[in-house]
């Protein structure tokens, strides 16, 4: 399965992991300095969830992001699926 949410379109993002050293200025030091930078990926918080669809009258097993789960709580499953289909997700 891909790491893309089918309802919100969230997917992994790119970024950097920074290595720092030194003593913070709050602790009477000279400050923190960046000594290295490593590429990394930020993954969306994905969960596998069984959701009841009232239109189809059955459970749907979806791998969705937690933000999509909050959206389903707010709007309802059918509205969120209709919105995703209209956006082409």
UniProtKB/Swiss-Prot annotation:
It comes from the Bacteria. One of its GO terms (biological process) is translation. Pfam families: Ribosomal_L28. GO terms for cellular component: ribonucleoprotein complex; ribosome. Keywords: Ribonucleoprotein, Ribosomal protein. InterPro entries: Ribosomal_bL28, Ribosomal_bL28/bL31-like_sf, Ribosomal_bL28_bact-type, Ribosomal_bL28_sf. One of its GO terms (molecular function) is structural constituent of ribosome. Belongs to the bacterial ribosomal protein bL28 family. This is Large ribosomal subunit protein bL28. The lineage of its organism: Bacteria, Pseudomonadati, Chlamydiota, Chlamydiia, Chlamydiales.
